[in-house]
Amino acid sequence: MSFIAADGTMALNQDVNLEMAGGWSRAFTPHSFKLKGNKELGGNKNLNYPFFTAKPFIRNRTLQIRNGGNDTGCRIKDAALQSIIQTSGIDIDLQSYQPIHEFINGKYMGVLNMREPNNKHYVYANYGWDEEDIDQFEMSPDSGYVQKCGNEDAFNRLCELSANAADPVAYNEILQLLDIDEYINYMAMEMYVGNTDWPQNNIKG
């Protein structure tokens, strides 16, 4: 992987793993994929460069190069919406975005979206927490509930408490498990932008 900054300097040059990414969007070209640092290939475990200037830099272990997902026409809808929300002052976690010109073996592929990962590595990149310190899951129609790291105890307890959320004692315990303000902001934003690939898909927590 070679990353040339806007000023023309070689900002990063190292061997990485390349992995195809996306669901339905795998059928579209250019393809979406993930880049992962790998010591075994003679590179580094991390990708040590601040690709996303809108957030403080801690480290990057993986990057997503996206073709726009289901937005295959202009390819910027998701990135534009997240950028607008990011600069709005709303308290909500989201993936930073950087447009890039992609070349593969010298062949120009077009303008794609470089994004932060939306997996366990996101937590370290934004909060400095290792995967041993978190519980992370994903849900989709194809896979159902999948525990990515940690365990499901806190999520199961949250579901139990939610059935009786009007009870003050239960609600106070919910507040210990869930950032309720950010959760409300998240739900409001998904509904406001009209995300049609959610909530039946793309659930992560």
Model-based region annotation:
Residues M1-Y186:
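Phosphate-handling architecture centered on phosphoinositide signaling
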Residues L35, L178-G205:
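Active-site acidic catalytic loop and adjacent metal/ATP-binding pocket
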